[in-house]
Amino acid sequence: KRNPLFLLKSFEWRSLHSTQIPYYIIPQIYFGYSYSPDRFSYGSLVNQWAKYSGKTALYVGLGAYKIGAGAECEKADWESGRLLEKQIKDLRSLKYDGFVVFSYSSLFSNDPLNTSEREKISQLIGAE
């Protein structure tokens, strides 16, 4: 019996993309800019995904649940109170179609870092 995670990891979305057109693709990029190894850092992954263009909308899943609790190598990113704001600005400059936040409820914690991130995102969205 195959592990469903293996099947998910081995899914080749580009073959689907060439035969059927999905409405959107949402890579879950839940890493900070200083994540190590660098090939999995936020900046590296969004630049890689930005190369895939076509008729399919491209959004990015952002890991709000990691606010204040990222991996040791990226801890400063997740404790800045501005990481999601920076990530969203970068997505806009790369012409992504949007973003999705997981878990949205994480933004509404009473923790000062979560509050800061929520306020920064609200300002960005309000500036559109």
Cite the ranges covered by each PLM segment:
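Substrate-binding cleft of secreted/luminal carbohydrate-active enzymes
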Residues: 13-38, 54-128
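Beta-propeller domains
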Residues: 1-3
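Surface-exposed amphipathic alpha-helices with a cationic face
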Residues: 46-54
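Charged helix-capping and loop-helix junction motifs
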Residues: 7-10, 40-46, 82-84
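Mature, folded catalytic cores of secreted/periplasmic enzymes
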Residues: 5-8, 15-16
